[in-house]
Regions:
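Short beta-strand/loop segment that forms part of the nucleotide-sugar
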Residues: 2-13, 32-38
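Active-site-proximal specificity loops/subdomain of glycosyltransferases
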Residues: 17-66
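Conserved glycosyltransferase catalytic-site signature
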Residues: 56-61, 79, 84, 161-165, ...
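Conserved catalytic core of nucleotide-sugar-dependent glycosyltransferases
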Residues: 64, 82-181
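Short beta-strand-to-loop acidic/aromatic patch adjacent to the donor-nucleotide binding site
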Residues: 69-82
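Short glycine/serine/threonine-enriched helix-capping/active-site loop
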Residues: 36, 100-105, 209, 213-215
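C-terminal catalytic/acceptor-binding lobe
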Residues: 154-155, 159-162, 182-238
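Short, charged/polar "capping" segments at the starts of alpha-helices
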Residues: 13-20, 109-110
Length: 238
């Protein structure tokens, strides 16, 4: 889908996740891999034991500042991304002075595995045929309209889980200087970057197309409910 992909592996204890999944990836010469070891991650988060284990604001900024495209997307590895033609349509039809967040749709490994069991041909060559899975998910899914306010009166948390796909021009990302790097704990940082866009007099809008999918992983991940991350950012500070 993308002209350039930058993968930031943050704080993996032994080795980058990339080495476990690279056999399922078609590399096209546009992939950059940056590893932040546990030792460096600790230094960058002021040796704070309560910092988010996968510190999103720092990891995202490392990628954003090295990206070279006209439009930059901040996203996660548990997302099945839009089709290229749909993403190009988004860019062509929308305002270059607006910061966008695209609402994710839902899938899980049970649905994915059932699809490949039914379509054995695709299972045998997953990395070359995964697009068929995405087309299937698009056909059986609907737009996810799920609004959310982080705190009362908050006009910036315009959809739930807004950080799974945020897109804006490079000029907007540079003007707002990316994510706020004091927000090293979990929650609210994705809403905060949208607030920063508005404060810099850019537009802010939620979209429900193009279709993209979050692969459910239960309580594991970068959130607050899984027991890994013990502290949340202050929503009023954010």
């Amino acid at each position: 889908t993308f002209d350039e992909v930058i993968y930031i592996d943050w704080n993996s204890p032994t080795h980058s996740l990339l080495y476990d999944i690279k056999h399922n990836i078609n590399f096209k010469g546009n992939f950059k891999h940056i590893v932040i070891s546990p030792e460096i991650a600790s230094i960058l988060t002021n040796n704070d034991p309560q910092a988010q284990k996968c510190c999103e604001v720092l990891g995202r900024n490392i990628g954003l500042r090295r990206a070279t495209g006209d439009y930059l997307v901040s996203t996660n590895i548990d997302i099945i991304h839009p089709r290229l033609e749909d993403l190009e349509k988004l860019i062509q039809q929308n305002d270059k002075n607006t910061f966008y967040t695209v609402s994710r749709r839902y899938t899980n490994w049970e649905q994915i595995n059932n699809y490949y069991e039914t379509n054995e041909y695709y299972h045998l060559d997953f990395k070359n045929n995964w697009k068929s899975l995405r087309n299937y998910l698009i056909n059986v899914s609907t737009e996810r309209h799920f609004d959310e306010k982080t705190v009362e009166g908050d006009d910036f948390s315009i959809i739930n889980c807004c950080g799974d796909f945020q897109i804006a021009t490079k000029e907007i990302w540079n003007e707002i200087r990316g994510f706020e790097e004091e927000l090293i704990y979990t929650l609210y940082a994705d809403t905060n970057v949208q607030k920063k866009a508005v404060m810099h007099e850019f537009g802010l809008k939620a979209l429900y197309e193009p279709a993209l999918f979050h692969i459910d992983h239960g309580k594991g991940g970068g959130g607050f409910l899984d027991g890994i991350n013990k502290r949340a950012n202050d929503p009023y500070r954010a």
